[in-house]
Amino acid sequence: MLPEQSAFGRSAMPGSDAVNPGPSPFAPPPNSFSGDFLGLSLPDEEHLWGMSPLSSSMPSWNGKNEQMFSNPNLERDLKHSHVRNGQPTPPPYGDNKTHTVGDLYSLSQCQFSNGAQNFQTHNDRRSFCEQSAINSNGGSSKRRKVRDAKMTQAEYNEQQQEKAKREKFLERNRLAASKCRQKKKEHTQLLESRYREQSDKKEQLVSEIARLRSEILGLKNEVLKHAQCGDEPIKLHLAQMVKKITYNDTTAPDLTDVPDAASSSEGPMTPRPQQALSFGFDDPLHLEPSRADGSTDHSVRRDSEASVLTENSYAFSTDESFDDLINV
């Protein structure tokens, strides 16, 4: 192999990254290659580098061009370049290391893995957003549930307070009603006891009235037994009783015609002072006005009383109308 060919091989293939089968953009113009280089072929290196045979119009290679293509900066740029869609691309920023052919595949795998990782990161971010939205919705629903629970608790507490107030109000009403019933029962029992007492007292009074009437009747019978004794007060009392009986018999029809006459202060009730005088025959003061009239009047009265106290008058006093004498 000629020195030009080796120099061209070094300059044409600066690194393992230039795998593009097309013409390199860093190749010299066609008129810069020598004529004796056209007949050379690189069959052993074509399968490695993927280079097509050089055209016949390429001129001969000179050392000046070799020095130009042997620039280490260009080799470094070519080593760090990437070929995409048939065009070399600049290396990643901050990459100062040289790469081999195996590094290209690892770099492509790394780029693919980075893309997959970015896609996975995007999916994770989206799932995180969805999870955040779900959590926010769940949190809002939880807050709503908590708020509803608080409202329900407040309503329950309010209902319990109202129920307690209602129970207290009903308890007071029941207590007041119980006291009222107890008081009414005690009042009823008091009235019943007073009724029994008054009934017993009434029975006692009725029995006392009956006893007194029987006693009055016995006393009047004793007075009638002494009617023939000649005692002036007894004779006067009997005469007044006879007058009252006869007066009641004569005024009975008038009283039936005029029922209000008994309730009036004037009328047949005028003889009551005489009744008082008749029961006061033991008192000599009631007889003094009659004695002041004179001896003649007194003698006439005695004669009239003697005429009244006959057997006929005594028989009249002992008939069925004698019950009226009891009430005199």
UniProtKB/Swiss-Prot annotation:
Record's keyword annotation contains Transcription regulation: yes
Keyword Membrane applies: no
Keywords: DNA-binding, Nucleus, Stress response, Transcription, Transcription regulation
Species name: Aspergillus fumigatus (strain ATCC MYA-4609 / CBS 101355 / FGSC A1100 / Af293) (Neosartorya fumigata)
GO biological processes: regulation of transcription by RNA polymerase II
Main localization category: nucleus
Disrupted gene: phenotype observed: Increases sensitivity to osmotic and oxidative stresses, but also to cell wall-damaging agents such as Congo red or iprodione. Shows increased resistance to low caspofungin concentrations, but is more sensitive to higher caspofungin concentrations. Leads to attenuated virulence.
Annotated region described as Leucine-zipper, given as residue ranges: 205-219
Similarity-based family: Belongs to the bZIP family. ATF subfamily.
GO CC terms: nucleus
Feature: compositional bias, Basic and acidic residues: 283-305
UniProt feature, compositional bias: Polar residues: 262-277
Disulfide bonds: none
Domain bZIP, residue spans: 163-226
Induction: Expression is induced in during osmotic stress and repressed in the absence of the mitogen-activated protein kinase sakA. Expression is also highly induced at low and high caspofungin concentrations.
Compartments where found: Nucleus
Organism superkingdom: Eukaryota
GO molecular function, one term: RNA polymerase II cis-regulatory region sequence-specific DNA binding
UniProt protein name: Basic leucine zipper (bZIP) transcription factor atfB
